[in-house]
Amino acid sequence: MSKQSSCAIMGKSLSFSLSRGERADLEMPTDPLVLGVKRMMFDRETSTFLLISTVFLNINEKDSHLKILCCNCVSDLRTRINLPCVLIQCRKYNSEAFKYCILLLHNLNRVERLLSFELNHALDENTKIFDGPIVFWQYLNQFFYISSAIGKVTTISLMLSSIEWIGEIENFGLGFLGLAEPSEDKCTQKLSESDYEFSNSSLCAYALKSQEMLSNGYLIPLAYSTMVTHVHVWAAEMVDHQLRTSLIALTRKNQLILFQNGIPVRACQLPFPGPRSVQILDAGKRNRFFIVSFPSKACAVSEKKFKVVAKWEQLSLVLVNDFAGVGTEQVLVVFEDSLDADQLTSFTVTDFVKIWYSTKPLDCCEDPLAEEEHENYYLVLPALEGQLDNSFIFLNKIQQHISFKDKFIAKSWKALLNAVYGKGDSLPSDEMVKLDQDGLVPFCDEGEDSVPTPEENLPDNFPEPEHIVEQTWCHVLDDDLVVGAKVTSLKESNEMTLSLIMNQGNRSSFHLMKCHSQVWLLKHMKCERIQECTEIYLYKKLRNCGALFSWEQRTASEGILTIYCRSQGVLFQCLDHLIKVLPEICSFKYLKVENEDFLVDHLSSTLEAELVTFCSVSTSAFEYVRGGYNCRIRRTDNRAMTFLGRRAKIRQSKRKVQRERILKHLNMTVNGSSYAEMTLALAEIQLKSDLIVKTLANFVIAL
């Protein structure tokens, strides 16, 4: 039996182990190995971890020695869904070749063998699994990787001492960070002042596919990179062909350092030697903590104070997830004496803010006033935030009121001048002074609403200008000023121009660039049109999103945006970005969630309705034909009552025989309108069932 490996997903702890049957004690056992998956969930009422289920999944590897190298919860780039991933080593008895397989756990009853590859050497337990999933390892100073997209082992031809991170870079794609091997002359030189600049970093970024260097700047200065033992990239984005990063580095001097665009911002001295890895815990309300793991030890560093707030020793497992089910993350620390039990007996679950469940006392490193300061901070902060929000709301109302007054005064002044000079314009209606459309700020320039004054000495036959613009608005998005206009004319957009009046002596005009509401989708939301279906946009801003947008234009300044997502988590991420762009008055409507059970139930009911419709159509056609035939027979039967005796019986028998012959050769037809109604009803119900079957098939393929 191999060692036990654990990971966390959706607030549950998953433990993986390999075991055999009853003859596992033989030298070469023949029983097939099974993968045991133990799922545990935290119960807040009892403050304990309870065993939910234990499932054993067969692995078709006979006469082999199996070993779990590592497991991790990674993102499947095919579906953008986080799934538990396990890397298993298989070695046939009396064989020197090593076979490796990557398994994805979709649910408790289904395991997907994603990749299988063979090597002539064994991988150690330091092998890493990244999102993709992508497996990286090092052998004889050479780096290799395999991914689900390539499907084969690929060699990295670069001379690197280590690979610290691999993932998606926003606006670029897959990349990785590696420490370049220092040359001999650099090893003998002393560090100069230029060595401390971020442009001379030996930590470089590379493109995974082409293995070309993206940047060696804005990462880590050379003076720090020689001491780095681990790097965790917080954020990475390609801006104007330059890589911008925020990363956390662990050094040989037992330090945790935060770098932003190559500049060391903050540093913290760690309590234990030999830091190995770091995880980020997001406790909500801008409370983040860095969970640093050591051999059998761990500590937590606050992002705000950049100090150690807790530390633990004699540990066997450290995981970060939403174990309490409150919507924010917590850290699970499992001590050495309880990992193999069905129910964890020694653990700690905390977010260092409000949640703290522990079977052992927490070793805090704060001063004696930290607890009182911590309590007062979270008592005062919500009240201050609420007061600040109310102040912003009050300020917005004042600005709207002042804007309304200015608009009303301008319109009233225009109406007064029109009345003095005998013009027929009246006060604007309520719709003209309504200022809350689309949440945009109205333009109140005098140049737009001005009227000719007597000093201008205009002729009497001067034509009144055609007012084609009913209202104008502006909206600031990042560094751009977006101007919207509600037009009343039916002219084409290429016949219009938009003028920006800075002052009376400086006026500039330019052609109308966009007359629809799709600019924000393409630029600010970073969407891309699908060539095969131009009305659908692919949302590419999030690296783990994979959402589709459908924009239906209603008016020049109004439309309906439909979002198609594969999960609720992706939907929340899309809404988080949309709220920053959309106006405040827009409304949201949650349509429906189509899971597998819903589709199966809907399909069964639709098939039942299809069967009932088919039966009713057949019955209606038969009743129509039989009704016409019965009318013909009924007229013949009325004359049969006049005959008596034997002659009447003979004729009655003769008519019965003739009736059967007519029934055999009868052309059973219905009229056109009845047939069309029956066929249409049957076609509609069959179309519904076919659409549900297609949706269910796509759902199964996505899983």
From Swiss-Prot:
Domain of life the protein comes from: Eukaryota
Intracellular or extracellular location(s): Nucleus
UniProt record, GO biological process: bone marrow development; cellular response to camptothecin; cellular response to xenobiotic stimulus; gene expression; hematopoietic stem cell differentiation; interstrand cross-link repair; negative regulation of double-strand break repair via homologous recombination; positive regulation of double-strand break repair via homologous recombination
Entry keyword DNA repair: yes
Keyword set, alphabetical order: DNA damage, DNA repair, Nucleus
InterPro entries given in the database record: FANCB
GO cellular component, one term: Fanconi anaemia nuclear complex
Assembly, per entry: Belongs to the multisubunit FA complex composed of FANCA, FANCB, FANCC, FANCE, FANCF, FANCG, FANCL/PHF9 and FANCM.
Function in brief: DNA repair protein required for FANCD2 ubiquitination.
Protein name as it appears in the record: Fanconi anemia group B protein homolog
Source lineage: Eukaryota, Metazoa, Chordata, Craniata, Vertebrata
